Amino acid sequence: MASTKPLSRFWEWGKNIVCVGRNYADHVKEMRSTVLSEPVLFLKPSTAYAPEGSPVLMPAYCRNLHHEVELGVLLGKRGEAIPEAAAMDYVAGYALCLDMTARDVQEECKKKGLPWTLAKSFTSSCPVSAFVPKEKIPDPHALRLWLKVNGELRQEGKTSSMIFSIPYIISYVSKIITLEEGDLILTGTPKGVGPIKENDEIEAGIDGVVSMRFKVKRSEY
């Protein structure tokens, strides 16, 4: 798939980060939530990107920052109302991603019936790995994701456990949001989410594909 911009640096120019919540039943259970008939969507700004080598910044207003490891899907061309059967034709590649979440803030937002923006969209809330070309992952539904904090395994799960498949998600999202080249879709997290603190080291990976490391620092704001 020809690209007019370097997908290897997607975090520098990609516009939209679309996130899917509640896409693994075991995570839905641990969060005491309910599996819904359609994907739960929320957005992160492009300033949420944190490529490997930069720190994960814990907002000053957050007292309970959680890690969520996810498979990210990179779009290679513009599309709207994409048929599910053609959805994979729009995929240029993948990235391992973290959906960093201010859990205490999110819980307050839920209680008040407010959007999750304060909990999900802060600077560096979307750490990402290097770009992985589509050809290196023949089946994105046959991957093992894992995450460690200070060497301790916290999360592991298989993408085969997704409730909504990647083609379905792409099609569903594109009927609401026009997707563009360089856009990233986070496809949900398996169970095992948990807290991190300042100076922790997060290591995450996709077995046999890619891994990444990040240090956690406290933001001044």
UniProtKB/Swiss-Prot annotation:
Mg(2+) binds at E68, E70, D99. Its EC number is 5.3.2.2, 3.7.1.5, 4.1.1.112. Its main location: mitochondrion. The modification Phosphoserine is found at S37. Oxalate binds at R22, K120. It catalyses: oxaloacetate = enol-oxaloacetate; oxaloacetate + H(+) = pyruvate + CO2; a 3-acylpyruvate + H2O = a carboxylate + pyruvate + H(+); acetylpyruvate + H2O = acetate + pyruvate + H(+). It holds the Pfam family FAA_hydrolase. It is found in: Mitochondrion; Cytoplasm, Cytosol. Requires a divalent metal cation for activity. GO terms for cellular component: cytosol; mitochondrial inner membrane; mitochondrial matrix; mitochondrion; nucleoplasm. One of its GO terms (molecular function) is oxaloacetate tautomerase activity. It comes from the Eukaryota. Its cofactor is Mg(2+); Mn(2+). Transmembrane segments: none annotated. Oxaloacetate decarboxylation is potently and competitively inhibited by oxalate. GO terms for biological process: oxaloacetate metabolic process; pyruvate metabolic process. The modification N6-acetyllysine is found at K110. Keywords: Acetylation, Cytoplasm, Hydrolase, Isomerase, Lyase, Magnesium, Manganese, Metal-binding, Mitochondrion, Phosphoprotein, Transit peptide. The modification N6-succinyllysine is found at K112. Belongs to the FAH family. Homodimer. NCBIfam families: PRK10691.1 (NF007967). This is Oxaloacetate tautomerase FAHD1, mitochondrial. It comes from Mus musculus (Mouse). The gene is Fahd1.
